[in-house]
Amino acid sequence: MRKKNDEDFILAYFEENEILGMVGFIRETGQKFRHKGHVWGVFVYPDHRRKGIANQLMLKLIDKARKIEGLQKIKLSANRTSIASVELYGKLGFKPYGTERNAAQYDGEILDEVYMDLQL
């Protein structure tokens, strides 16, 4: 079990008291790895995609992460077939550093994962 860390957070995007999207952030806890954090759970409901919600959430996440003392890098991964996600992360300054082949399976399809990071 992971020890609670006050620097971990979840951001949500609301419209008229309805949650339309969310993103999570978790900071590494080990002494050698505390300079890194991870983005997880980026999600926007399908009916609300392509409206800039993920962009707004990610901008807020990056801003919040920059204020965490000692944090130097944010990492994330995205399914290679999720072109919009990979492009969004690239526009936000994330750089790809590797691909994991056969990282996941969904509906019988084998999927590759692109790993990206942003130096703060």
Indicate where each model-derived feature is located.
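Acetyl-CoA-dependent GNAT
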Residues: M1-D47, M58-K60, K64, Q119
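Conserved N-terminal glycine/acidic-rich loop preference
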Residues: Y13, F33-W40, L57, A84-P96, ...
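Short amphipathic helical patch at the helix-1/turn junction of helix-turn-helix
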Residues: V44, N79-R80
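Conserved G/P- and acidic residue-centered "switch" motifs that form tight phosphate/ATP-binding loops
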Residues: G52
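Conserved GNAT acetyl-CoA-binding A-motif
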Residues: M58, A65-A78
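Conserved catalytic-core motifs of GNAT/GCN5-like acyltransferases
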Residues: K75-A78, G90-L111
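Terminal substrate-recognition subdomain of acyl/acetyltransferases
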Residues: E109-L120
